[in-house]
């Protein structure tokens, strides 16, 4: 949408009369045109007055009667001028009233921006509070991250300790397995020795029985003519005693060796069992600590995720509020720009009307000088040599408005 305002200036080289044509000021234009016509009429009549004065002067040289007629004519013309001055003053008063009404109607209007101060202050306070909350949340997130890093370091150290303890437990299990295998071997050897002892006892009993049977048979059927020999029962008793002593000794040695081996293995098994129990207790304690650390780590991670979500929501809310505030600021700036444009247009219109008023006041002052008794002959002489020349200038002002904003303002003067 484009508005065009035309300003037409008409000037004379002598007394100047300005005619301005404005689309919104038809009454002012008509009054200004009336002032122009009055000025032109005044100049023409003053010129005719000058010519009449010249002719009157010539006639005064020729006769007194013509001078009296000339003075009468001048009095009539002066009365006509006074009537026109009165009508011009009346038109000037009307024009001033219209200018005043126009300025009151289209004067610069100022919007009251104080109503926006309170919501803007509240928004600034909310932005400040949200900034402080955001900084607090960031600090809490950093603290949570540091705590999570500390717990991660502790968890890694506990994990390494757990792995070392598990390695020790596996080594102890291997020792226990080796001990069990050795115990099984010893039990096998003990069983074999028991079987061997039983076999030896059985052989010994069989040999004793055989010897006894031989002794009994020999005592019944054998007749010895020779001298009596050694006592066989005594010999057999000695042999039996000797074999029983050897068997008892072997049995005692085997039992002592087995007892010593079993005592050693029992001590070693007890020691290994104690170590295994302590390792199990340590593993249980480590498992409990690891579980508590894992639970605490999960809680910290969940708190971190919740804080990050809160931070994202807060940043999104801040961004939306900032966009709203920026939109309000842009709207206010657009309104301010439009108000400034309206004020500039009104100032230009006011200057145009002020120029019209000044020109009219100049013409009124001229008429007042006539009324105050200024020498007409001097005025006629000063205006008799004036050549009236009219220069017409047209000023075209083009304003381009898009969405209530003045995009371009171009002024072109056409001669």
Swiss-Prot record:
One GO MF term: structural molecule activity
Annotated spans, Disordered: 1-25
Region (Tail) location: 374-415
IF rod domain ranges (all copies): 67-378
InterPro entries linked to this entry: IF_conserved (IPR018039), IF_rod_dom (IPR039008), Keratin_I (IPR002957)
Spans annotated as Linker 1: 103-119
Site features described as Cleavage, chain residue numbers: 225-226
Chain residue ranges for the region called Linker 12: 212-235
Family: Belongs to the intermediate filament family.
Database matches in PANTHER family: INTERMEDIATE FILAMENT, KERATIN, TYPE I CYTOSKELETAL 18
Protein name per the record: Keratin, type I cytoskeletal 18
Taxonomic source organism: Scyliorhinus stellaris (Nursehound)
Gene behind this protein: krt18
């Amino acid at each position: 949408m484009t508005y065009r305002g035309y300003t037409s200036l008409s000037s004379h080289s002598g007394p100047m009369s300005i005619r301005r044509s404005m689309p919104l000021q038809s009454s002012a234009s008509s009054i200004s045109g009336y002032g122009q016509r009055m000025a032109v009429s005044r100049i023409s009549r003053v010129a005719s007055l000058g010519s009449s004065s010249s002719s009157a002067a010539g006639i005064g040289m020729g006769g007194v009667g013509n001078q009296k007629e000339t003075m009468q004519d001048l009095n009539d013309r002066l009365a006509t001028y006074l009537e026109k001055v009165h009508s011009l003053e009346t038109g000037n008063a009307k024009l001033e009233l219209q200018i005043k009404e126009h300025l009151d109607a289209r004067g610069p209007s100022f919007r009251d921006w104080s109503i926006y101060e309170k919501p803007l202050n509240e928004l600034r306070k909310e932005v400040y509070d949200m900034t402080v909350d955001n900084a607090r949340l960031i600090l809490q997130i950093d603290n949570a991250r540091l705590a999570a890093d500390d717990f991660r370091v502790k968890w890694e150290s506990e994990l390494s300790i757990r792995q070392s303890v598990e390695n020790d437990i596996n080594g102890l299990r291997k020792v226990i397995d080796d001990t069990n295998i050795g115990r099984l071997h010893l039990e096998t050897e003990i069983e074999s020795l028991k079987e061997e002892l039983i076999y030896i006892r059985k052989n010994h009993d069989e040999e004793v029985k055989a010897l006894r049977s031989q002794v009994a048979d020999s005592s019944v059927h054998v007749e010895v003519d020779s001298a009596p020999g050694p006592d066989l029962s005594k010999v057999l008793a000695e042999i039996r005693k000797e074999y029983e002593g050897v068997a008892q000794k072997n049995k005692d040695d085997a039992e002592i060796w087995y007892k010593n081996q079993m005592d050693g293995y029992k001590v070693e098994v007890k020691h290994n069992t104690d170590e295994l129990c302590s390792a199990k207790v340590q593993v249980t304690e480590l498992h409990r600590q690891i579980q508590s650390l894992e639970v605490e780590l999960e809680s910290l991670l969940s708190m971190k995720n919740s804080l990050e979500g809160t931070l994202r929501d807060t940043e999104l809310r801040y961004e939306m509020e900032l966009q709203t505030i920026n939109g309000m600021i842009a709207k206010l700036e657009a309104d301010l720009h439009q108000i400034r444009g309206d004020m500039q247009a009104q100032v230009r219109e006011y200057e145009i009307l002020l120029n019209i008023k000044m020109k009219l006041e100049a013409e009124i002052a001229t008429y007042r000088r006539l009324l105050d008794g200024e020498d007409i002959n001097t005025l006629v002489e000063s205006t008799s040599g004036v050549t009236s020349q009219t220069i017409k200038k047209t000023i075209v002002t083009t304003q381009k408005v898009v969405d209530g904003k003045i995009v371009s303002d171009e002024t072109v003067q056409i001669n």
